[in-house]
């Protein structure tokens, strides 16, 4: 018995949509990484050092973004199951009107 009106199918659909968007973002980051590696050959001297420093910052930021995407996707995946279990446990303690 559920006491609250949660749209569990919507949570599952949101997780699927988020996974697709996260995959697209990871792909875009990967493409940017490849483009940067190709562009690195055109830099020389101080320009090369500056480019490498900027590229290192980009790689670090991309790693953080990927970690956050993983966390968000895992949280969405657990949300429906956790909600259903907690709601069912709380519903059994409800005595009625």
From Swiss-Prot:
Major localization class: secreted
Disulfide bonds: none
Matching InterPro entries: ESAT-6-like_sf, T7SS_ESAT-6-like
PTM annotation (N-acetylserine): residues: 2
Keywords attached to this entry: Acetylation, Secreted, Virulence
Family: Belongs to the WXG100 family. CFP-10 subfamily.
Quaternary structure (record): Forms a tight 1:1 complex with EsxH.
Protein name listed in UniProt: ESAT-6-like protein EsxG
């Amino acid at each position: 018995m559920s006491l609250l009106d949660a749209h569990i199918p919507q949570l599952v659909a949101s997780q699927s949509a988020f996974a697709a968007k996260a995959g697209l973002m990871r792909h875009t980051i990967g493409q940017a990484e490849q483009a940067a590696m190709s562009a690195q050959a055109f830099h020389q001297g101080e320009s090369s050092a500056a480019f490498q420093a900027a590229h290192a910052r980009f790689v670090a930021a991309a790693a953080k973004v990927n970690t956050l995407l993983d966390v968000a996707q895992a949280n969405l995946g657990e949300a429906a199951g956790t909600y259903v279990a907690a709601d069912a446990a709380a519903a059994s303690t409800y005595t009625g009107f």
